[in-house]
């Protein structure tokens, strides 16, 4: 029999074993589509970003006008920019749903896969943050100033660290230049970590909605899940294109249409929508260092999730109490997102503090407690 090049070629056999002949559980639902959607988001962002970088100038006196020039005079520049800006939003929607799926179905018990995923989330957040500074509008400048300033809360080395990050005594040209360098570099770092993420995943194989071993019933990834992924892809691209073509500035801040001015502070400094939940947690603590620690904890808490799993069952499929708690957490995150977009005044302050407290209570105390309770209920 003639050798199959797909299975014998050194490069093709790697692709084959991870995308074609990969044994996959027969019962994974649409919640398992988001991994491939994230890969597509990353590819789209790298391609549109590369095209934008060809027309961008990382200089404080030229950055704003170079972005405006791209939108006005470059062929389809407006489309490339709108896809890139809104593509970031869809990237975060997909990653939040992907993490939510992992939480619900106990995928975090694959510890290496989960931990590399958390590193990917942190890298993505860093990339989005430095990218938001590049158009050099008012919110770009003040967002950069406020968030980088948080490092000054670190005892002893804080102030030195901030000035080192800025490349001076305020956010200025050196800051913009290095942020552009980082924004160009980090997506490729994300791509590298993604390969590690997949390597760890393929060691164990995918989890499934029942949370039990699926070794007895596996199907090839291609054509079943390649086709399912293409369907998911189409369903994601339709709203992305709708947003980019009909309402491209819906999720942006109007302040960013004004060029950066260090002498005028915008009335409400707030990040893009996907950071609002963390921003609300940061603001809910009246102490600077405390706020920074809470901000870090809000994301890093994901690393503790595998150790807080007390249930005998892996997924929440047959655990109604944990399900209720899970959706309570989702609602809580939506409240935090809303609070992050509101001014710091009554009643938003107290709502934010309650929601922040609930967030940590649900994850650190209630999930393990309810898991243990459900184990007890199995005996009756």
UniProtKB/Swiss-Prot annotation:
Superkingdom assignment: Eukaryota
SUPFAM superfamilies: a domain/subunit of cytochrome bc1 complex (Ubiquinol-cytochrome c reductase) (SSF81648), Transmembrane di-heme cytochromes (SSF81342)
GO MF annotations in UniProt: metal ion binding; ubiquinol-cytochrome-c reductase activity
Recorded topology in the membrane: Multi-pass membrane protein
InterPro entries on file: Cyt_b/b6_C (IPR005798), Cyt_b/b6_C_sf (IPR036150), Cyt_b/b6_N (IPR005797), Cytb/b6-like_sf (IPR027387), Cytochrome_b (IPR030689), Cytochrome_b_C_euk/bac (IPR048260), Cytochrome_b_N_euk/bac (IPR048259), Di-haem_cyt_TM (IPR016174)
TM region positions: 34-54, 78-99, 114-134, 179-199, 227-247, 289-309, 321-341, 348-368
GO CC field: mitochondrial inner membrane; respiratory chain complex III
Annotated positions binding heme b b566: 98, 197
Residues given in the record as a ubiquinone binding sites: 202
Subunit-structure text: The cytochrome bc1 complex contains 11 subunits: 3 respiratory subunits (MT-CYB, CYC1 and UQCRFS1), 2 core proteins (UQCRC1 and UQCRC2) and 6 low-molecular weight proteins (UQCRH/QCR6, UQCRB/QCR7, UQCRQ/QCR8, UQCR10/QCR9, UQCR11/QCR10 and a cleavage product of UQCRFS1). This cytochrome bc1 complex then forms a dimer.
UniProt miscellaneous comment: Heme 1 (or BL or b562) is low-potential and absorbs at about 562 nm, and heme 2 (or BH or b566) is high-potential and absorbs at about 566 nm.
Role played: Component of the ubiquinol-cytochrome c reductase complex (complex III or cytochrome b-c1 complex) that is part of the mitochondrial respiratory chain. The b-c1 complex mediates electron transfer from ubiquinol to cytochrome c. Contributes to the generation of a proton gradient across the mitochondrial membrane that is then used for ATP synthesis.
Protein name from the UniProt record: Cytochrome b
Origin species: Francolinus francolinus (Black francolin)
Lineage start: Eukaryota, Metazoa, Chordata, Craniata, Vertebrata
Gene assigned in the entry: MT-CYB
